[in-house]
């Protein structure tokens, strides 16, 4: 199978601009599996709950999932991408898996980082593994974790024990340790991993977060 990630710098709170930026790049990719960063439609460093509410969407009914579905169908690829999810009055830092058939699955980030727990609920769906196929019809099992989930060895181990062959890892990494650790996660669990990080900077109340990029694909 062929796998790819798309690394870019999302514009804070501009969903339309971020979808356009991805659309301009993703259509040139030729891969069975494409992974996008965490919160790719919204940016990360939310100034308030009102800002988050402005960009959060239901999954799979939201417009961003619809865009992902369009790309998955037109590219004949499975996509994994991070989105701010709204369910009623609750918000989750989620990843959506979209297949070329249009079928969607959701994972909600379990291990929240820094100030995320002031806005998002911890994920309540557990670590999930999904049955997918390559465009040649070869089946494989796809696990998903989001950003800081990498820090806890049990996350990748749980996915591996559930039968994952590949772990997709949408991220917004600001600390330098993950790129060194993901090869270990792949090796110790005998899985392939794909970390799709973003780059750029975001500011809030005089504090700046610098996202490190350094997306990577690791083998066992």
Task: Locate the predicted segments by residue.
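Extreme N-terminal starter segment of soluble prokaryotic enzymes
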Residues: 1-5
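Cys-nucleophile CN-hydrolase/nitrilase-fold catalytic domain and related Cys-dependent amidase chemistry
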Residues: 24-100, 106, 175-189
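Active-site catalytic loop in hydrolytic enzyme cores
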Residues: 57, 86-162, 171, 177-184, ...
